[in-house]
């Protein structure tokens, strides 16, 4: 019965909207409170602002009054959609808010012509994995997620440096 009461209450008080960079500080505070969610170097304000501008309207915020209680970063590369940092305030978990944010992300991805989405869930995040399974996501087999930092190993190629490497100085 409690879940039904909370869900009915949520429909009247929880509002969702587009994630704005002005929401960044509150979103980070929420990310820190959600078990299993890791904040990485690419989650700084400048990087998130760039992500939001490349993927307008896809990332979502859920508020209860003026308090942010849910966040999802969503984008695509033109072929596949990606959902990053889905987070729901622990007090609101189990109310359907996470699924609601995912559905809104999917709606935006469909509108953009994207047919498939991918998420990464940490191996040790059992609760997160169970959430995604309940949302009908499946683990992909036959692939391993791999990554590498893109760091400058040499100075950027300026016109002067390009010319000097060609012997055209």
Give the location of each predicted region.
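A short beta-loop-alpha structural element at the N-terminal edge
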Residues: 13-27
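Helix-loop element at the rim of GNAT/NAT acetyltransferase active sites that forms part
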Residues: 18, 28-42
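Active-site rim helix/loop that mediates acceptor-substrate recognition in acyltransferases
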Residues: 37-61, 65
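Conserved beta-strand in the GNAT
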Residues: 61, 67-75, 82-87
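A conserved beta-turn-beta hairpin within the catalytic core of GNAT-like acetyltransferases
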Residues: 75-84, 93, 139-143
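Conserved acetyl-CoA-binding loop-helix of GNAT-fold acetyltransferases
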Residues: 94-107, 134
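Conserved GNAT acetyl-CoA-binding A-motif
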Residues: 109-121
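Conserved beta-strand-loop-alpha-helix junction that forms the acyl-donor binding cleft
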Residues: 119-128, 147-150
């Amino acid at each position: 019965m409690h879940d039904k009461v909370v869900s009915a209450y949520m429909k009247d008080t929880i509002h969702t909207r587009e994630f704005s960079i002005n929401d960044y500080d509150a979103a980070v505070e929420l990310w820190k409170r959600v078990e299993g969610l890791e904040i990485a170097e690419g989650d700084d304000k400048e990087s998130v602002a760039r992500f939001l501008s490349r993927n307008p309207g896809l990332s979502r915020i859920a508020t209860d009054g003026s308090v942010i209680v849910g966040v999802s970063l969503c984008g695509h590369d033109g072929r596949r959609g990606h959902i990053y940092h889905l987070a729901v305030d622990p007090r609101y978990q189990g109310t359907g808010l996470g699924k609601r944010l995912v559905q809104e992300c999917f709606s935006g991805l469909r509108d953009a012509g994207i047919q498939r989405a991918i998420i990464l869930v940490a191996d040790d995040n059992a609760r997160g994995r169970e959430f995604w399974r309940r949302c009908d996501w499946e683990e992909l087999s036959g692939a391993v997620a791999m990554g590498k930092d893109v760091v400058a190993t040499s100075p950027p190629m300026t016109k002067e440096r390009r010319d000097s490497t060609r012997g055209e100085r």
